[in-house]
Each structure stands twice: as structure tokens, then as C-alpha cells.
A protein has these predicted regions:
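Catalytic histidine-centered segment of alpha/beta-hydrolase-like enzymes
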Residues: 161-175
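Hydrolase active-site cap/lid region
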Residues: 66-123
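Conserved alpha/beta-hydrolase
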Residues: 1-23
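Short alpha-helix in the alpha/beta-hydrolase fold that links the catalytic acid
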Residues: 114, 123, 137-146
């Protein structure tokens, strides 16, 4: 968050239940439903403080589920979307645990449906993905970009980075791209 503040970008971070400093048990349902009260609070707070800048949603990895849920539900409440290391479908998550969706009786309609949600998103989109991501393959970032019908979209590959060190490998490129995206939204 310090780097964002140095660039005059306000940033609010929310953990999932059971992650970071948050208690509770993480579930697929909570991943989607918990995003709504967080956005409600953010919108209330921004209104209270007379904030006039653009609101941009950003989700990292599993956070792509939350921001795409919000993008589908509240498309007029924010101006842009940043997805870092996100996924279009759940297949990489199953592979991570050494199984296939079929082995556990998983059906696409039971999943997060990130691909279906991004295929309806028309606003500005920035996708940042590590090229050597060992958890969510780079091809998932490409798929998110390709499924999105927006005319204002960009994929930023981070070479030599994996899922967990994407910020540390080339922070200059990472933050330049985020800053460029945000400033373009401020002008538009």
C-alpha cells in the first residue's frame, strides 16, 4: 500500500474470511457474497468524504472472483477493473490439488463463472499476470483478456515472475502499468 500512496493512489485492501488477519472459514459462497458489503462500505465512505476520483476494483488471484462478481452486479459504481493473476475457469485450481473437476463431480455452473462474468464486462480492463505463474497459468490471464468485449483492455505479462513474487520481480513495470491505467481513467 505504501507504493500506491507514494503515487497518490488510495487503496483499500480486504481479506477473505480465513485469510490474512480475517477470521472465519473461507468458502466459495463467501468469496462472492463478502465482496458486496465491502463495496457498500467503500461507496458509503467515499460519499461521506466527498471523494470525486474514479473508483477502480482490483482483485488478485482468488480476488478475481470478488471483483468480477461486483463488476457484474454493479457495473456503474466503478470506472475500471484490474485483475492480477486471475483465472477464467477453475481448472488450474483443481490441477493444483492434483485432481480434475470430473473426479469430484464439479460442474461449470457450480463454479465462480469468471469467464462468463468477464464476457459481459464492457469497461476498461487491465490484466497483469506472471509469465511463469505456477498456480494460475499465464494462459488464464490471456483467456480473461480475450473473453472481455471491452475496447479498452490490456494484458501486462511480467516475465520471470511466478504467482507469489510478481510484485518483487519487476515492481517498476508493474506500478508503471497500474499508474498509466489509473491516469487514463482520470482523464476519461
Amino acid at each position: 500500500a505504501r507504493v500506491y500512496n507514494q503515487k497518490n493512489i488510495n487503496f483499500i485492501i480486504a481479506d477473505f474470511r480465513g485469510y490474512g488477519f480475517s477470521n472465519g472459514t473461507p468458502t466459495a459462497k463467501n468469496t462472492k457474497s463478502d465482496a458486496h458489503p465491502v463495496l457498500d462500505y467503500v461507496l458509503w465512505h467515499l460519499k461521506k468524504e466527498n471523494y470525486i476520483g474514479p473508483l477502480i476494483l482490483m482483485g488478485r488471484s482468488l480476488g478475481s472472483v470478488s471483483v468480477l462478481e461486483l463488476a457484474q452486479r454493479y457495473p456503474n459504481d466503478f470506472r475500471g477493473l484490474i485483475i492480477e493473476s486471475g483465472f477464467a475457469n477453475e481448472e488450474p485450481l483443481f490441477r493444483l490439488f492434483g485432481m480434475t473437476p470430473e473426479q469430484v463431480g464439479f460442474k461449470i455452473e457450480d463454479g465462480f463463472q469468471n469467464g462468463a462474468k468477464i464476457s459481459k464486462y464492457q469497461g476498461p480492463l487491465l490484466v497483469i499476470h506472471a509469465q511463469q505463474d505456477h498456480i494460475i497459468p499465464f494462459s488464464q490471464g490471456e483467456e480473461l483478456l480475450n473473453l472481455c468485449p471491452s475496447k479498452k483492455k490490456k494484458l501486462v505479462p511480467i516475465p520471470n515472475a511466478n504467482h507469489n513474487n510478481i510484485l518483487g520481480v519487476n515492481p517498476q513495470k508493474y506500478f508503471e502499468e497500474v499508474e498509466r491505467f489509473i491516469h487514463a481513467l482520470n482523464k476519461g
